[in-house]
Amino acid sequence: MKTLYSLRRFYPVETLFNGTLSLGGRDQETTGFAWWAGNARLINLSGKLLGAHVAHAGLIVFWAGAMNLFEVAHFVPEKPMYEQGLILLPHLATLGWGVGPGGEVIDTFPYFVSGVLHLISSAVLGFGGIYHALIGPETLEESFPFFGYVWKDKNKMTTILGIHLILLGAGAFLLVFKALYFGGVYDTWAPGGGDVRKITNLTLSPSVIFGYLLRSPFGGEGWIVGVDNLEDIIGGHVWLGSICIFGGIWHILTKPFAWARRAFIWSGEAYLSYSQGALSIFGFTACCFVWFNNTAYPSEFYGPTGPEASQAQAFTFLVRDQRLGANIGSAQGPTGLGKYLMRSPTGEIIFGGETMRFWDLRAPWLEPLRGPNGLDLSKLKKDIQPWQERRSAEYMTHAPLGSLNSVGGVATEINAVNYVSPRSWLSTSHFVLGFFFFVGHLWHAGRARAAAAGFEKGIDRDTEPVLSMTPLN
């Protein structure tokens, strides 16, 4: 493969502890990168880079399969999923596999099948990764020109982008087909308690779907995180899948316009930085989704959201004290506001106390008690059902709180059972990963831009103090 520029010009870092260390033509002398720079040594070896990526995919899928089987092996059907530290089975249950009314697990075999399928897939990917890393051609350009590429080839790069977009679109449509034709998905809002149902009446109105993107990110609006029905979620995936597929076809058939050629840096490291920027946004969005949304992430599987646990506690004590004779409509709390009920700034009747900040929570166990103007006092006095009391007591004691200081009034107990909500795990991990990807995006974008501008020098070693010191040995 012809190299269009001197590697040294772009990768001039020249510090190797052992200058003779050679890695099969992938040493520092030939690539400009030391062993610890990992895949950077493979920038111009498309065959070996393919091996690294396939092997990486194998590791990801192996984790999914192994962890899936680990969760199946440890699963106790009598306990809720969120009490058992599970993060994969809740996703499978949300897709409608193995669960029945109320989110009760009736069959764990689909979970076992999922784990085995992922393990088998990981073996295939692992073999492919090892083959391309060790045996296959170092570069693909000569033998398989369709799979070969030069990083500067703008047309080829947008073709690869298009292929990726089509695959993402197909993934979005897999969820649509599951919800429409293959057994449906779990709907926490199904009448009479959550249940698996086919989503028939999709929301395809662009004003509704794209309206989410224009909403405020705060409060009950919550940008796209505020979606509260499966019709909108599945309809959104129809739109998203269609846009990805048509965008992919567009990028395969067209060449980048002049403004795009000028605006972007066209190098491997630049593409890495763009991808990390996208993954960072995904991570932060997923963090907010799993923390606040109880439709895409049903509380039956993931445990209550923070606001949900807080409102559940207010409801639980309202029920208790009403039974003991309290007049919940007029009792005054220590601040002079209503102890059990008060009014929101816009006049709705809401729960009183510290949970007032979560007044715009919506949850399946609470909505039946609302009227046209917030909570309905007569329903609270006459219509509370035993299942609502049980659900709120359960959620009150399973708040997704670590050692937070501000817990929305939820009673915290230092000697409580060792419980960490999957919402805590998933939102924290995705926030941290989103942040790290953002830092990686800045780092690689800066390096790529500097290299393109021609002043990427690495660290100047000539004036380093260590050079004038006595060797340690």
From Swiss-Prot:
Cysteine disulfide partners in this protein: none
Keywords, sorted A to Z: Acetylation, Chlorophyll, Chloroplast, Chromophore, Manganese, Membrane, Metal-binding, Phosphoprotein, Photosynthesis, Photosystem II, Plastid, Thylakoid, Transmembrane, Transmembrane helix
Residue numbers carrying Phosphothreonine: 15
Any one GO molecular-function label of the UniProt entry: electron transporter, transferring electrons within the cyclic electron transport pathway of photosynthesis activity
Transmembrane intervals: 69-93, 134-155, 178-200, 255-275, 291-312, 447-471
A single GO BP: photosynthetic electron transport in photosystem II
Cofactor note: Binds multiple chlorophylls and provides some of the ligands for the Ca-4Mn-5O cluster of the oxygen-evolving complex. It may also provide a ligand for a Cl- that is required for oxygen evolution. PSII binds additional chlorophylls, carotenoids and specific lipids.
InterPro entries registered for this protein in UniProt: PS_antenna-like, PS_II_antenna-like_sf, PSII_PsbC, PSII_PsbC_sf
Membrane topology: Multi-pass membrane protein
Propeptide residue range(s): 1-14
Primary localisation category: plastid
Residue positions, PTM N-acetylthreonine: 15
Assembly and binders: PSII is composed of 1 copy each of membrane proteins PsbA, PsbB, PsbC, PsbD, PsbE, PsbF, PsbH, PsbI, PsbJ, PsbK, PsbL, PsbM, PsbT, PsbX, PsbY, PsbZ, Psb30/Ycf12, at least 3 peripheral proteins of the oxygen-evolving complex and a large number of cofactors. It forms dimeric complexes.
Family indicated by similarity: Belongs to the PsbB/PsbC family. PsbC subfamily.
Protein name: Photosystem II CP43 reaction center protein
Organism of derivation: Angiopteris evecta (Mule's foot fern)
